[in-house]
């Protein structure tokens, strides 16, 4: 059985990152879109990133941000992976010069395979419940039966928590799951018990 990878997104505090790593998370997401409630300054993210143990990936999230800002953040944080959550064109994504994944707004895109075909350079696709122009981390979910078979890894997001992630994995068979609000006590503030329960549910 293939192991389902786990990404905790919206990390803003070193203590949350350390707890997540101790629990066995595979990747941590840092949001660099200023309008997000989970925005983190690049210097703060860099300090957290420097203390990550081996084999825990740092993911930088952007949503229709200015290319100069993206380049600035990448130069400071040096993320392992960049996640584009908006309406960025494939050329804009590739310009960052690092491996990248593209979010798919499932509330707006019916033909996911056709949308994904426009992003041939993506390392994978993150399927989230939001509509185009909306941010992730809303706690909403979508119909998991809509997850298509793609030629690259699929990361499942949107409304996941310890109570439903096992069912989501069984139904959608994603490469990875991504959670933010489902492990929080407030936006950007992670809850250790919820993190622990989420990882236990995935591994179980």
Regions found by a protein language model. Give the residues of each.
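Conserved N-terminal beta1-alpha1 strand-loop-helix module at the mouth
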Residues: 1-204
């Amino acid at each position: 059985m293939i192991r389902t990878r786990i990404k905790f997104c919206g990390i803003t505090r070193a203590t949350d990152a350390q707890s997540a790593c101790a629990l066995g998370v595979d990747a941590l997401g840092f949001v660099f879109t200023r309008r997000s409630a989970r925005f983190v300054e690049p210097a703060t993210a860099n300090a957290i990133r420097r203390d990550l143990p081996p084999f825990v990936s740092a993911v930088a999230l952007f949503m229709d941000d200015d290319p100069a800002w993206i380049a600035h953040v990448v130069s400071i944080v040096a993320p392992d992976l960049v996640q584009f959550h908006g309406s960025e064109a494939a050329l804009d994504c590739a310009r960052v010069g690092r491996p990248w994944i593209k979010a798919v707004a499932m509330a707006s895109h019916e033909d996911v395979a056709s949308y994904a075909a426009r992003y041939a350079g993506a390392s994978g696709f993150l399927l989230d419940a939001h509509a185009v122009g909306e941010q992730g981390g809303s706690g909403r979910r979508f119909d998991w039966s809509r997850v298509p078979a793609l030629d690259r890894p699929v990361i499942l997001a949107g409304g996941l928590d310890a109570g439903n992630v096992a069912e989501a994995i069984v139904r959608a068979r994603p490469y990875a799951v991504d959670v933010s609000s489902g492990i929080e006590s407030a936006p950007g503030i992670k809850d250790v018990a919820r993190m622990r329960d989420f990882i236990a549910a995935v591994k179980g």
